[in-house]
Amino acid sequence: MTKLEDLRPTPGSVKPRKRVGRGIGSGHGKTSGRGHKGQKSRGSGKVHMWLEGGQTPLHRRLPKVGFKSFTHKNYAIVNIRLLEEKFSANDEITPELLLEKGFIKKIKDGVKILGSGELTKPLIVKAHAFSNSAKKAIEMVGGKVEVI
């Protein structure tokens, strides 16, 4: 049986730390493996990855495009086809009910009802937004649309 104190790292997997600047006999003395002069020999002499010498950097070569609208709403989407299949006449449908039954993963900024599919029974639908076609389809069969 292997004991915890018997465990050893695989030979060759653990290398000794490189001690630099400890005399010329060590092989890493004087310039500590950095060579002579130049930016990379200095104390904080790193060249950032976005620097490209004298060439115009990529972020300045590419045009400025678009933006993220901070008023954009990310709705959870439900089509009336789903409401037709899963609910019976005169049911009251709320975002919480849709979430509970697993028709949407999360409410996000609200629920939007879209008009894909046919609706034949009246339903009371409460949601944050409706497409025009969905609103028309729900009201045409005698249902109610309520924006919350």
From Swiss-Prot:
Protein's name according to its UniProt entry = Large ribosomal subunit protein uL15
Reading the lineage from the top rank, the first entry is Bacteria
Q: Which InterPro entries match?
A: Ribosomal_uL15 (IPR030878), Ribosomal_uL15/eL18 (IPR021131), Ribosomal_uL15/eL18_sf (IPR036227), Ribosomal_uL15_bac-type (IPR005749), Ribosomal_uL15_CS (IPR001196)
PROSITE patterns in UniProt: RIBOSOMAL_L15
Identify the stretch(es) annotated as Disordered: 1-47
Q: Name one Pfam family in it.
A: Ribosomal_L27A
Q: Which family does it belong to?
A: Belongs to the universal ribosomal protein uL15 family.
Q: Which GO terms describe its cellular component?
A: cytosolic large ribosomal subunit
Keywords of this protein's UniProt record, alphabetized?
Answer: Ribonucleoprotein, Ribosomal protein, RNA-binding, rRNA-binding
Q: Name one GO molecular function term.
A: structural constituent of ribosome
Record note on quaternary structure: Part of the 50S ribosomal subunit.
In the record, biological process GO terms are: translation
Compositional bias (Basic residues) = 31-45
Gene that encodes the chain: rplO
Function field: Binds to the 23S rRNA.
